[in-house]
């Protein structure tokens, strides 16, 4: 019975130890070494995370002293700063691109950039949580905490890999868009130069004509221009004449209406004054007649 218990204990310890050991993995294509600064910075973050996943004695010691989270913070900031710088560099080359396409690509790239930053932040927070749990050790053994941390790190690592690959693809599309915009700009310049060359050839051909032909051509263009100006002037004069006639008619109508209003205002007043004046004269005459003495008769 004791032998059986011993075998079971050894088997359980071996299983816990096996969970802690990370499986060997090749270097992922998303963090391959390249010439782009942001990929180099992400590669340093990735290498450091692979080292943390070993959960060696040195790793556990630095986890408890917050050394690991501090290192990850620096690597995170370097990576996101490099991504932002590379994105700004590409935006300078996207000027010839249509604004709606440029806005869409920028929005997609910004979302992928945010996801990568959130993944790295989640890794750092999980390691900080492990540090707190190890310091507290509330009802759990160190082996259990390490096994759970190893499992979480494997999941976070896969998520980080997926979002890093997505960001890499978005940046590639962004770069292709910048290249296409630059090609369109070069094509537009080429077309403009060809147009200028064609105009120069036409001017050279015109210069090579005899003086008389050039004079006739200029005279013909000048006559055409004068006729056009004369026609425009006549049309304008006719418009002015019509406008003046309309103004005259309107003024006459307004004057007649005003005269009618004045007549309507003053005729009743004049008629009333006439009646009052006639009444006044009658009253005066009556008063004068009444006050005149009758001549006395002589005997």
UniProtKB/Swiss-Prot annotation:
Chain segments carrying region Specificity for association with VLDL: 261-273
Residue positions where Methionine sulfoxide is found in the record: 137
A GO BP entry: cholesterol metabolic process
Residue numbers spanned by region 8 X 22 AA approximate tandem repeats: 74-245
Intervals holding Sequence repeats: 75-95, 96-117, 118-139, 140-161, 162-183, 184-206, 207-225, 224-242
Residues given in the record as heparin binding sites: 156-159, 219-226
Gene Ontology cellular-component terms listed: chylomicron; extracellular exosome; high-density lipoprotein particle; low-density lipoprotein particle; multivesicular body, internal vesicle; very-low-density lipoprotein particle
Modified positions (Phosphoserine) in chain numbering: 141
Any one GO molecular-function label of the UniProt entry: phosphatidylcholine-sterol O-acyltransferase activator activity
Family the UniProt entry places it in: Belongs to the apolipoprotein A1/A4/E family.
Protein name, per record: Apolipoprotein E
Source organism (scientific name): Ctenomys sociabilis (Social tuco-tuco)
Organism ancestry: Eukaryota, Metazoa, Chordata, Craniata, Vertebrata
Gene: APOE
């Amino acid at each position: 019975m004791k032998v059986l218990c011993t075998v079971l204990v050894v088997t359980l310890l071996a299983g816990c130890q096996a969970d802690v050991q990370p499986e060997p993995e090749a270097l992922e294509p998303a963090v391959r070494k390249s010439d782009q600064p942001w990929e180099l910075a992400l590669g340093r973050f990735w290498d450091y995370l692979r080292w943390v996943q070993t959960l060696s004695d040195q790793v556990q010691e630095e986890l408890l002293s917050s050394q690991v989270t501090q290192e990850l913070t620096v690597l995170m900031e370097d990576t996101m700063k490099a991504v932002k710088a590379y994105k700004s560099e590409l935006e300078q080359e996207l000027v010839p691109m249509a604004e709606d396409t440029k806005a869409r690509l920028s929005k997609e790239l910004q979302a992928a950039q945010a996801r990568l930053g959130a993944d790295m932040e989640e890794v750092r927070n999980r390691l900080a949580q492990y540090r707190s749990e190890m310091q507290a050790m509330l009802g759990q053994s160190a082996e259990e905490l390490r096994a759970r941390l190893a499992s979480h790190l494997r999941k976070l690592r896969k998520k980080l890999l997926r979002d890093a690959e997505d960001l890499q693809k978005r940046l590639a599309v962004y770069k292709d868009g910048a290249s296409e915009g630059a090609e369109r700009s070069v094509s537009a310049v080429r077309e403009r130069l060809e147009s200028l060359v064609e105009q120069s050839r036409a001017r050279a051909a015109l210069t090579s004509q005899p003086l008389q032909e050039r004079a006739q051509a200029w005279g013909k263009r000048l006559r055409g221009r004068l006729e056009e100006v004369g026609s425009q002037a006549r049309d304008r004069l006719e418009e002015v004449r019509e406008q003046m006639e309309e103004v005259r008619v309107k003024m006459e109508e307004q004057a007649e209406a005003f005269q009618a209003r004045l007549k309507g205002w003053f005729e009743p007043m004049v008629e009333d004054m006439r009646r009052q004046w006639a009444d006044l004269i009658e009253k005066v005459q009556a008063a004068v007649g009444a006050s005149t003495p009758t001549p006395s008769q002589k005997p």
